[in-house]
């Protein structure tokens, strides 16, 4: 989905992804590299308990709030709060420099139990090492895991990860929208549990792409939620995103399963820009297929491709055209084929209602495309199961609109009640 907000005020903008799809014979050609294999067990006993999809650095705007991705960091400490979906007795973090243009120098890293805000519970802070060293360098285009550290954790527990930078990083690899804040302090505050120096904050994650756990109940695989801002959680507060609610639902049923949010607000099937992530077929391998132990993926995509034809956005090419349902369906099929080649189940989420949004995205022609794609998702049998977001969100008297009780103030995205209703509709037996 394509609409961003800050937690300090309701500031919303239609965002999207630029770039033309590679088209041949009217169909988007979306080949995804995938070596046929079965879904692997978590590597070495490790399970990815939290993760984020990385993006190129892009300036913040009045609508989506400021971020530090363009300037980067120098002689600063950055503390980021995440919530695990599964616990264990050991923890490691993974850092990404996938969009970096120079080596990323990490002077230090630490992890501990979050005490709210930028605070960490005293006695829980553990310094991290990388191949036995306190500092490390992440090559451009690469990711790197820390050495494991002993830290008992539980499902749904929040951790604070602190990174120390002593040299200018330049523009950062990051995830733009979160419902958690990242905190910045000048100087070295790596292991301080409470510090007034963490006075600056933004709603983004920087370099941190994953947190893994080992030694717990033994996760029965990983579920990845993949797609646009509906997956990213725009319109929600706190930990009310689909991945969060699904983790809670699985934990309540005693099913140890990790759930990863690989959503990017504004993401599309047919085009990419720096603002809203690589197009879905391009990033599917990194954000879904290459994660350890993935057994199923929930996919919600297509709304931004439809909406981009009617909006004006500096990140989008002017004069966009409405895609055909066939183009979007072919994009979905490419993702399904790639998932199945790895033994991963694919659950298709129907596109949520677009009519009534505060942004000029709806038209009868756009509705026809949405209806055709949704009909295919529901009836083709190509997805292993269906999460019918459209019917969950629809107003019963006007199904092209969302029901007011489930919609955020932008008239499009779910509010917390809407996200909770979507989570209840997830077919757990298909995961």
Language-model segments: which ranges?
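Structured segments of extracytoplasmic/periplasmic soluble domains
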Residues: 112, 248-253, 262, 287, ...
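Conserved SGNH/GDSL esterase-like catalytic core that processes O-acyl groups on lipids
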Residues: 50, 74-80, 103, 107-112, ...
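Active-site segments of SGNH/GDSL-like serine hydrolases
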Residues: 300-305, 335-370
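Short hydrophobic segments within beta-strands
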Residues: 226-227, 349
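Solvent-exposed loop/turn segments at secondary-structure junctions
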Residues: 167-168, 229-233, 264-270, 303-307, ...
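N-terminal secretory targeting modules
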Residues: 2-19, 25-226, 235-238
């Amino acid at each position: 989905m394509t609409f961003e907000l800050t937690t300090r005020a309701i500031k919303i903008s239609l965002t999207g992804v630029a770039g033309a799809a590679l088209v041949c014979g009217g169909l988007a050609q979306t080949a995804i590299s995938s070596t046929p294999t079965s879904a692997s067990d978590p590597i070495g006993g490790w399970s990815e308990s939290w993760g984020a999809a990385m993006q190129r650095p892009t300036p913040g705007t009045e609508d989506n709030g400021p971020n530090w991705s363009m300037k980067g960091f120098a002689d600063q400490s950055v503390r980021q709060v995440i919530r695990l979906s599964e616990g264990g007795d050991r923890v490691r973090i993974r850092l990404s420099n996938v969009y970096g243009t120079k080596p990323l120098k990490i002077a230090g890293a630490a992890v501990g139990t979050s005490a709210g805000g930028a605070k960490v519970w005293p006695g829980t802070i553990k310094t991290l090492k990388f191949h036995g060293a306190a500092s490390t360098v992440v090559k451009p285009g690469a990711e790197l895991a820390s050495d494991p550290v002993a830290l008992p954790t539980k499902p749904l527990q929040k951790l604070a990860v602190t990174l120390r930078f002593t040299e200018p990083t330049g523009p950062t690899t990051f995830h733009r929208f979160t419902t958690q804040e990242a905190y910045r302090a000048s100087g070295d505050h790596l292991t301080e549990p409470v510090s007034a120096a963490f006075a600056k904050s933004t709603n983004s994650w920087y370099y941190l792409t994953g947190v893994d756990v080992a030694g717990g109940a033994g996760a029965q695989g990983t579920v990845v939620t993949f797609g646009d801002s509906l997956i990213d959680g725009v319109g929600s507060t706190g930990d009310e995103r689909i991945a969060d609610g699904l983790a809670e639902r699985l934990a309540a049923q005693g099913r140890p399963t990790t759930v990863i949010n690989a959503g990017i607000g504004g993401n599309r099937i047919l085009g990419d820009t720096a603002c809203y992530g690589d197009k879905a077929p391009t990033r599917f391998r990194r954000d879904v297929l290459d994660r350890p132990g993935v057994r199923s993926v929930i996919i919600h995509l297509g709304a931004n491709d439809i909406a981009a034809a009617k909006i004006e956005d500096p990140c989008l090419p002017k004069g966009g055209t409405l895609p055909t349902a066939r183009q979007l369906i072919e994009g979905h099929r490419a993702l399904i084929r790639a998932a199945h080649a790895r033994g991963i189940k694919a659950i298709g989420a129907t596109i949520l209602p677009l009519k009534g949004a505060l942004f000029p995205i709806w038209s009868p022609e756009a509705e026809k495309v949405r209806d055709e794609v949704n009909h295919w998702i529901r009836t083709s049998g190509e997805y292993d199961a269906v999460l019918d977001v459209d019917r969950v969100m629809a107003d019963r008297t006007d199904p092209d609109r969302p029901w007011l009780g489930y919609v955020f103030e932008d008239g499009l995205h779910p509010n917390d009640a809407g996200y909770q209703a979507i989570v209840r509709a997830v077919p757990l037996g298909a995961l």
